């Protein structure tokens, strides 16, 4: 969309006009939410919105721009396969979702190259015809904002429902198994992923946050102290019970280690030991409590982030700021409460063990003790 002109204005003229108005727009396509954003000076909002709406309604195909865009995407894909972090992220996504996931739901090279850009432009023209929300952050009075929207935001009398998205399911982990992906490096990236299918429960959130702070958080947390400082088995390490982003998704427990290839099995054994038999330290707990309370005291959600925090809360069925309850309960929380939480929510889990490393340098016999090994190609991980 940012590459297109209209029947009346070239792309250069559009960019010049937005520059004069000290405004700009952006487009954010997502797997379950797409939004367009207009930002700039209050006094120029009507003109900027009129221009923006003109682009939505009258964007014209630019085949040369599409060819360049497709080429850029293919170049980024090639670069991504060379990056250790990108490979590891795709491996984690495979463990969470399985072979069919939002991460692999991408156009093939042939589809990218052969696509008619008119299809994309037609979708731009239709975006205002679907159900949507309008969010506003700024100094203008509410009624003035409504008046501007009514005047410049072009919508049909009857909006259409948003087309159903492709549904992907996060896979549970009923038994231990290993996913191994080849990457030529002297250091492995390792993660254990566990999903028992437990859905969002606001009642556990304060204790969950304190557990994460105490056990898997920063440099004073148990994981970092045990795995790096005490045992020297990892360059970096962490472990967290991750809160779902939507009600339909489950909690996922996930660990992370970066270590030398020859230390892989020792690191995995040590990690399993502290996860299932969590060390208890009042000193470390008090540091974690102080860190969490201090962060809550100083953290501010401001400007347009207030709107997004509100939408994120709605996605979990909440109508209040969950940090308030967390702050109140954190004051009196105790280490035995964290231990009880760990016994119920963490201990004894089964995992998908993910290893990204150079296979020729790894102890595959030792790795097989953690479950059957499935070797994955980059095509399986990236979807192309």
Give the ranges of each region predicted by the language model.
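Ordered, soluble secondary-structure elements with a strong preference for glycine-centered loop motifs
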Residues: 8-9, 60, 64, 201-205, ...
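Active-site SXXK
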Residues: 1-7
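Active-site lining segments that contact anionic ligands and/or coordinate catalytic metals
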Residues: 175-176, 187-189, 205, 220, ...
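His/Glu-based metal-binding/catalytic segments typifying zinc-dependent metallopeptidases
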Residues: 161-222, 256, 383-384
């Amino acid at each position: 969309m940012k590459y297109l002109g209209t029947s009346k204005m070239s792309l250069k003229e559009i960019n010049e006009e937005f520059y004069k108005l000290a405004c700009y727009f952006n487009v954010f396509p997502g797997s379950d939410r797409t939004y367009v954003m207009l930002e700039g000076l209050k006094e120029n909002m009507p003109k900027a919105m009129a221009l923006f709406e003109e682009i939505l309604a009258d964007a014209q195909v630019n085949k040369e721009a599409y060819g360049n865009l497709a080429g850029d995407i293919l170049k980024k894909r090639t670069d991504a396969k060379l990056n250790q972090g990108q490979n590891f992220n795709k491996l984690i996504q495979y463990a969470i979702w399985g072979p069919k996931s939002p991460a692999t739901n991408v156009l093939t090279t042939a589809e990218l190259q052969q696509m008619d850009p008119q299809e994309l432009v037609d979708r731009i023209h239709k975006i205002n015809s679907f159900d949507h929300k309008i969010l506003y952050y700024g100094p203008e009075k509410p009624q003035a904002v409504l008046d501007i929207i009514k005047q410049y935001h072009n919508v049909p009398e009857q909006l259409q429902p948003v087309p159903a998205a492709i549904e992907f399911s996060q896979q549970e982990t009923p038994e231990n198994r290993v996913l191994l992906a080849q990457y030529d490096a002297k250091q492995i990236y390792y993660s254990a992923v566990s999903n028992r299918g437990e859905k969002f429960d606001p009642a556990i959130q304060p204790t969950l946050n304190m557990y994460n702070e105490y056990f898997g958080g920063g440099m004073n947390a148990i994981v970092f102290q045990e795995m790096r400082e005490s045992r020297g088995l990892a360059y970096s390490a962490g472990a967290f019970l991750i809160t779902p982003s939507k009600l339909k998704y489950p909690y996922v427990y996930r660990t992370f280690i970066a270590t030398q290839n020859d230390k892989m099995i020792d690191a995995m054994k040590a990690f399993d030991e502290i996860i299932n038999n969590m060390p208890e330290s009042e000193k470390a707990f008090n540091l974690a409590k102080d860190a969490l309370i201090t962060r809550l005291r100083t953290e501010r959600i401001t400007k347009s982030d207030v709107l997004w925090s509100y939408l994120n809360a709605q996605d979990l069925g909440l109508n209040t700021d969950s940090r308030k309850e967390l702050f109140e309960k954190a004051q009196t929380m105790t280490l035995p409460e964290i231990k009880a939480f760990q016994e119920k929510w963490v201990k004894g889990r089964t995992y998908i063990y993910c290893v990204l490393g150079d296979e020729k340098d790894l102890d595959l016999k030792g790795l097989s003790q953690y479950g059957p090994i499935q070797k994955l190609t980059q095509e399986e991980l990236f979807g192309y």
